[in-house]
A protein has these predicted regions:
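Asp-box/WD-like beta-propeller blade repeats and closely related beta-sheet repeat scaffolds
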Residues: 80-161, 174-184
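Hydrophobic beta-strand positions that form the internal "hydrophobic ladder"
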Residues: 49, 105, 150-151, 198-199, ...
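Repeated scaffold domains used in trafficking and secretory/extracellular systems
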Residues: 35-39, 87-97, 134-143, 182-191, ...
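Loop/turn-rich, solvent-exposed surfaces of beta-rich toroidal or solenoidal domains
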Residues: 258-262, 272-312
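Blade/loop signatures of beta-propeller domains
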Residues: 1-23
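Conserved blade-ending motifs and adjacent loop-strand segments that build the rim/top face
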Residues: 238-239, 275-284, 312-335, 373
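Blade-level signature of beta-propeller repeat domains, shared across WD40, Kelch, NHL, RCC1
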Residues: 328-380
């Protein structure tokens, strides 16, 4: 492909309630999506933001990866591969992980991993892992380990077996983790795994409708060594959605209904409620572990920015997303390493697009000081 910068698609706006500056990064009338919120996809210097955009308007259309400056300028296409979406990708999007230094993007197409240069888009083949995947099976989900040596991939057919790829040698092998790799601790060579078989199905609701639910076993979080040994309990099933708290060994996430809180859990202690208030839905943490951003629902109270040391939070901005069942309507906010940029998605225009909110130091300090949106909005 010919890699050249595209014209900016940015639309700048100010949240009318909070005064926070928000930039719509993608505006072309095709679905766009940011990266999952469990791992940074903003370069450590806050220069570039990575996101996906669908190549054309069709149910199984492929997704390409772009980078853009944090101010919405210098839109640049990094990848263009395959003619259809990834069958076992994240809603059709190929799994991708940014390296610790933000210079390399590891992208999984099929069962083959490539390294993509974030500045130029040049691709390098890292490893083809077809020999570890049986017929009808596939690799999905990616977790980058402590010090960036290994990437763990889930086997779609198994809830216990992963593939571990050594980026130094290119050697890939099966490893029994006893669950699905959900994240890698960055303070020690351990992996957070979710044990239990998740089987998605539906159940009736009191109003005669149906809702999606897990018909399998309740998940439990453990940590294991990078070879699957030394299993340690983190916590039972308390989270609706969770991630590691940045580079720490703690886990943060939103409580299961009827809880309206963000939990913090770690090995050797009881989970604690960091804060309570609206129904926190999906939450991502800054790499330094100081900030958490969460969307809300039932009702939508906007994105909430939480200061971890104090547990104080305020409304950052309102996304205007539908927040309905389909994934495109979820804001799924993620936050930069230093907590100064928050990226989210909204289908407010009728087509899902990617946005960034710029968090001012004044706003951060107001949260630390315990300032509320309005006195009457205080949650008890």
């Amino acid at each position: 492909m010919l890699r050249t910068p595209f014209a900016s698609e940015r639309i700048s706006m100010t949240d009318p309630t909070t005064g926070i500056r928000v930039i719509q990064l993608s505006s072309y009338p095709l679905p766009a999506a940011h990266f999952p919120y469990y791992w940074p996809s903003i370069t450590p210097d806050n220069r570039w933001i990575l996101f996906y955009s669908q190549r054309f308007l069709q149910r199984n259309a492929p997704w390409d990866i772009f980078r853009v400056d944090a101010d919405g300028l210098n839109l640049f296409q990094l990848t263009e591969r395959n003619d259809v979406q990834e069958t076992h990708g994240y809603y059709g999007r190929q799994y991708a992980l940014l390296s610790h230094d933000g210079k390399t993007l590891y992208v999984l197409w099929g069962n083959t991993l490539y390294a993509v240069d974030v500045e130029t888009g040049n691709e390098e083949l890292i490893a083809c892992m077809d020999h570890l995947v049986g017929e009808g099976d596939a690799l999905s989900y990616c977790v980058l380990s402590y010090e960036g040596r290994y990437i763990f991939f889930r086997k779609v057919s198994s809830f216990v077996t992963s593939v571990r790829l050594d980026l130094r040698t290119g050697k890939a092998e099966d490893v029994e983790l006893g669950g699905i790799a959900m994240g890698a601790m960055q303070t020690e060579p351990r992996v957070m795994v979710q044990a239990g078989e998740i089987i998605w199905g539906s159940e009736p609701t009191p109003d005669g409708g149906r809702r999606i639910t897990n018909l399998g076993s309740k998940p439990v979080l453990y940590s294991v060594a990078e070879d699957g040994s030394d299993r340690r309990l983190i916590c039972p099933n308390i989270f609706a959605h969770c991630t590691l708290l940045g580079k720490t060994s703690k886990v943060q996430g939103c409580g299961l209904p009827p809880e309206r809180c963000i939990w913090i859990a770690e090995e050797g202690s009881e989970p604690r409620k960091l804060c309570s208030g609206p129904y926190f839905w999906h939450s991502g943490a800054s790499y330094d572990g100081e900030w958490i951003v969460a969307d809300t629902n039932w009702p939508d109270c906007g994105l909430q920015l939480v200061h971890v040391p104090t547990g104080h939070f305020r409304t950052l901005c309102h996304t205007g997303a539908t927040l309905e069942h389909y994934e495109f309507g979820h804001s799924h906010p993620l936050i930069s390493n230093d907590g100064r940029l928050v990226v989210f998605r909204s289908d407010r225009t009728g087509c899902p697009q990617v946005y960034v909110a710029h968090v001012t130091e004044e706003f951060r300090q107001s949260i630390i000081a315990g300032e509320l949106d309005r006195p009457k909005d205080k949650w008890i």
